[in-house]
Amino acid sequence: MARTSESSPYVEFDRKQWRTLRKSTPLVLTEEELYGLRGLGEQIDLEEVAEVYLPLSRLIHLQVAARQRLFAATATFLGEKHPDQQVPFVIGVAGSVAVGKSTTARVLQALLARWEHHPRVDLVTTDGFLYPTAELNRRGIMHRKGFPESYDRRKLLRFVTEVKSGAEEVAAPVYSHISYDIIPGQYHLIRQPDILIIEGLNVLQTGPRLMVSDLFDFSIYVDARIEDIENWYIQRFLALRKTSFSDPDAHFHHYAGLSDRDATAAAQEIWHNINRPNLVENILPTRPRATLVLRKDANHSINRLRLRKL
């Protein structure tokens, strides 16, 4: 049985317990499709999709239906003309750099898009809402890129508000990991999705005023030991020398020719000066706000889950 307590707002599962909640949910992904969704260094396989993500997609499917009934009840109370109009269900996915939250978001998008009643599922990353490099330099916070203050939080909040309010088309800025900057004039157009997934480092943050996390209907925090995340970050950094960093136009092209030893030292410096402080100070404290925490072992596999029941 799942571990719970009458006085706790959470119920905890190991993977064996969680997988029983899949019920008859069919596996709709192929190995080839999963390969295209898997991030660099990720070890996710179809077994993990079946045992972790299918029960999760079933839970979200049930919550989408329940949330629509709640929205309809409020609309009826307000006397609106179309109380049954669908309101986009917004999911937040948070976690550290290199923890695998992007893979989680992509796999979830693929599974949810195949449910019968909500085929349109859009995914937007908060990278597009970083301030452009010129603005970060003007503010003197280029070294704080990825920290909460490096994002245009008002713009992100306005974007999600417009999507959830039913706007016919809303534009999300696009970020390039090659140029390490916002791409001028390029946008990801969101057109009235049934479900919108917002993935980013700091999406669960709160504040004295309305925050984007206040608009989430469901949220996921991808968790792991800090030491494991550091190791994954370093391994990913080493691998990027042969992929993204090898592009002559890449912002980090100067790392491409480093030896393993020098690249490891560079990655450790970035981790300890930027990514670890951001995780400890800003990201990790938001974990209790998540509806569901996915806990990874050192081999990247999800083996424990914590669901907020209240």
Swiss-Prot record:
A Gene Ontology cellular-component term: cytoplasm
Keywords carried by this UniProt record: ATP-binding, Coenzyme A biosynthesis, Cytoplasm, Kinase, Nucleotide-binding, Transferase
Catalytic activity: (R)-pantothenate + ATP = (R)-4'-phosphopantothenate + ADP + H(+)
Subcellular localization(s) per the UniProt record: Cytoplasm
EC number: 2.7.1.33
Molecular function in Gene Ontology: ATP binding; pantothenate kinase activity
Gene Ontology BP terms: coenzyme A biosynthetic process
Pathway: Cofactor biosynthesis; coenzyme A biosynthesis; CoA from (R)-pantothenate: step 1/5
Signal peptide extent: none
Record keyword Transferase present: yes
Sequence positions that bind ATP: G95, S96, V97, A98, V99, G100, K101, S102
Pfam families in alphabetical order: PRK
Keyword Electron transport belongs to the record: no
Residue ranges crossing the lipid bilayer per the database entry: none
Family that this chain belongs to: Belongs to the prokaryotic pantothenate kinase family.
Protein's name according to its UniProt entry: Pantothenate kinase
Organism of derivation: Rhodococcus jostii (strain RHA1)
